[in-house]
Amino acid sequence: MKNILLMCSAGMSTSIMVKKMTEAAAEINAEVAIKAIPEQQLNDHLAGTDIILLGPQVRFLLDKVQSAAKDIPVRVIDTMDYGTMNGEKILRQALAILGES
């Protein structure tokens, strides 16, 4: 089971993305747990996280999150994929980074 953490300013738009990614995971039988958090809760959710995906609106936090995350991969979600809520593509990219594709 891979744990994917999505982060945005308030956790609202990423909660929709969690739903889309969870649906995509079910379709491809990927064993993942996906959750969305606001940026203020990052440190509370690092333990057990395999990858952190940042919403495009918080891309300016990339260096800060990478520093806090240490060895956890951190990526910014593509603006177009985020805007169109392409959960399948984002999930597949995360799994590829984790070597699960």
Locations of the language-model features?
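Short, surface-exposed alpha-helical segments at coil->helix boundaries
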Residues: 15-18, 59-63
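Ser/Thr/Gly-rich flexible loops in soluble cytosolic domains mediating phosphotransfer, phosphorylation
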Residues: 3, 75-101
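Conserved active-site segments centered on acidic
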Residues: 2-39
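A short, gly/pro- and small-residue-rich
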Residues: 61-81
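Short acidic active-site motifs
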Residues: 40-42, 61
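Short glycine-rich anion-binding loops that position phosphate/pyrophosphate groups of nucleotides
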Residues: 10, 57-59
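Structural signal for conserved beta-strand scaffold positions within catalytic alpha/beta enzyme cores
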Residues: 36, 54, 76-78
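Short acidic/histidine-rich motifs immediately flanking catalytic phosphotransfer sites
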Residues: 46-51
